[in-house]
Amino acid sequence: MLCGGWKRSRRSPEESRVSAQVAAPLAFPPSPASSDSSTKRPGLRALKKMGLTEDEDVQAMLRGSRLLKIRSRTWHKERLYRLQEDGLSVWFQRRIPRAASKHIFFVQHIEAVREGHQSEGLRRFGGAFAPACCLTIAFKGRRKNLDLAAPTAEEAQRWVRGLAKLRARLDAMSQRERLDHWIHSYLHRADSDQDSKMSFKEIKSLLRMVNVDMNDMYAYRLFKECDHSNNERLEGAEIEAFLRRLLKRPELEEIFRRYSGEDRVLSASELLEFLEDQGEDGATLACAQQLIQTYELNETAKQHELMTLDGFMMYLLSPEGAALNVAHTCVFQDMGQPLAHYFISSSHNTYLTDSQIGGTSSTEAYIRAFAQGCRCVELDCWEGPGGEPVIYHGHTLTSKILFRDVIQAVRDHAFTSSPYPVILSLENHCGLEQQAVMARHLRSILGDMLVTQALDSQNPEELPSPEQLKGRILVKGKKLPAARSEDGRILSDREEEEEEEEEAEEALEAAEQRSRAKQISPELSALAVYCCATRLRTLDPSPGPPQSCTVGSLSERKARKFTREAGTSFVRHNTQQLTRVYPLGLRMNSANYNPQEMWNSGCQLVALNFQTPGYEMDLNTGRFLINGQCGYVLKPAYLRQLNTTFDPECPGPPRTTLAIQVLTAQQLPKLNAEKPSSIVDPLVRVEIHGVPEDCAQKETDYVLNNGFNPCWEQTLQFRLRAPELVLVRFVVEDYDTTSPNDFVGQSTLPLSSLKQGYRHIHLLSKDGASLAPATLFVHIRIQNS
């Protein structure tokens, strides 16, 4: 429980006098709603707080624009697009009426806005429109790009500039400001007659919108407590008072009282005591004073180095108060070690936007992968018409894209999110002539980015480091002299994969159509400098020095077999050489495997289908969330030491205890926005992903009919043997008695980057988009034996 005793005040008389002036708690920063024009148009309150109500571009977006939506050479449809007054969403007209939620998209879900013919769709289908009139809105997750053409270049620019301003303001918002923004957008929607007054019926509608099923009698009592005019309508300050009551955080108030005592403000020394109890390493009085200056809202309190409840809540909702160590969100690891010492974010079938049977191939898939920090992408290369190689999933109905278009996308987008090296994993099915074309395109398009020879002064027995290869692109491919099969043929890349899969999947042997044998062109072979592709059939050490520049490829099944039968040998192999693991060919729907199993053995290039959401991609996102999301994460020391004895199947006795007290959640999303009476019954599951003996999951009870501020106060405890490898996945589900629970949100974090104490967990959707302001509030304790 959160209950705790009072603390005696240790302040001077002057501090006590000031504390009495500033102690009154607020739920928000003071609202200007009752004293300005936003009272007349309450929906504009959000834009006013963003400082954008007078912006000409935003004003034009509020009025709306008729833009052409472009899908093909013949499909050009005019649609009305209009920014909503909440500043968070854009409404658009549809030819076929659908549910209201299907007529909007949210600014926070936008990945990028590109001008001109920068998207694949506009390059192919936008020739009839001037580039200056065109723009592309690219979304996070699986939502398709929106390719648009405006009547004039100026109107296109207004949307490009306006969306950029809105995204920048949204990114700069604190969690508390997002909450304020969020609740007022629902308030505007609940005000059915738009008279800036709220009847009890409208208040009940608001409560259902924000996922609260409140007893009518209790809701009416709250309503009447705020109805100071006694006219059965709330307006202005009365509405703000109601929202303050609604958004109270009793559990935070209890923690605050423990440290602040009777006068309800924290001095710098009391805040320092809280930080020390939190386990903040190196916390000092100066740190506490700086936090007060950063997060306190009351200027009088700030001047006297005091923190009110509002400032305390602002701090706990900030990145500094979150569960993820904010120091780990930038590049903090040693980037000067050999490539084999890092986990490297890797994609399989990167070109696909859907399944590998009939999905679409697109350069946009590469752009999205790079935006997510991916550093190793796959190019499945086949003979194309007109002497130009194409990329697609061979012998299927997937569409085809030109090899050169993909290389241009690599050139333009490989280093937008990370400066560290990119590996192009070539699956080569082309003849000698088109292989030579591939080599020419790689050299001419990538230029100096492409690594074409070994680095000067580099130890030939060791791979270079990410730091040495900043801004460079490596080719993973076959190197002459090529490996030969038992009958002496030179194998194609796909045959190698098939040979391994046939060993494990003999039932498919008759159905497999084997690629014809092909040689490797000298031009393409010369580009495989540090990533020479080879089959990894055995872990027996070969005579002579280690072949550090070879990359062993193997299926998920073969990797599991190595881990089970020769765990330590596999780990040692991966201390010096790169290993790429790919999904079995049986996964026709582009499903993923559990990457944690491969990371446990030190495999660096664990390739997943980035286009397929699920817990596997959640783990991948969590693994690479740290170190600036640069796509490289340093492996634990026992996965880097040449003579390591670590075996993921036998990791030794437990040496760490993790205790997570799940306290509350805030503002969970509705699962069915079109059904007001649909309220979630949330439960929280905490999953541990690590070596097999560490894997576990435990969950709380469910809370009936409350997605707004459910409370659990339940502790879940885990004993861990290899904590450095552990990922902790927090999952919120809607409990269902008759069918599987429905997913609400999740967050996956590396244990090594978790901070102890009272922390907020910021939840993500199934596609990885932010669900702000939805959070979990937990207490974390990590004890090492």
From Swiss-Prot:
Residues 178-213, 214-249, 246-281 form the EF-hand domain. Keywords: Calcium, Cytoplasm, Hydrolase, Lipid degradation, Lipid metabolism, Membrane, Metal-binding, Phosphoprotein, Repeat, Transducer. Its cofactor is Ca(2+). Expressed in cerebellum and cerebral cortex. Its EC number is 3.1.4.11. Residues 494-509 have a biased composition (Acidic residues). Disruption phenotype: Mice lacking Plcd1 and Plcd3 die between 11.5 and 13.5 dpc. They exhibit severe disruption of the normal labyrinth architecture in the placenta and decreased placental vascularization, as well as abnormal proliferation and apoptosis of trophoblasts in the labyrinth area. Furthermore, Plcd1 and Plcd3 double knockout embryos supplied with a normal placenta by the tetraploid aggregation method survive beyond 14.5 dpc, indicating that the embryonic lethality is caused by a defect in trophoblasts. It is found in: Membrane; Cytoplasm; Cleavage furrow. Strongly activated by phosphatidic acid. Inhibited by phosphatidylethanolamine (PtdEtn), phosphatidylcholine (PtdCho), sphingomyelin and phosphatidylserine (PtdSer). Residues 65-168 form the PH domain. Ca(2+) 4 binds at I679, D681, N705. It catalyses: a 1,2-diacyl-sn-glycero-3-phospho-(1D-myo-inositol-4,5-bisphosphate) + H2O = 1D-myo-inositol 1,4,5-trisphosphate + a 1,2-diacyl-sn-glycerol + H(+). GO terms for cellular component: cleavage furrow; cytoplasm. Ca(2+) 5 binds at D734, Y735, D736. Residues 333-478 form the PI-PLC X-box domain. The active site is at H348, H393. Residues 484-493 have a biased composition (Basic and acidic residues). Residues 1-43, 484-517 are annotated as: Disordered. It is an enzyme of class 3 (hydrolase). CDD domains: C2_PLC_like, EFh_PI-PLCdelta3, PH_PLC_delta, PI-PLCc_delta3. This is 1-phosphatidylinositol 4,5-bisphosphate phosphodiesterase delta-3. The lineage of its organism: Eukaryota, Metazoa, Chordata, Craniata, Vertebrata.
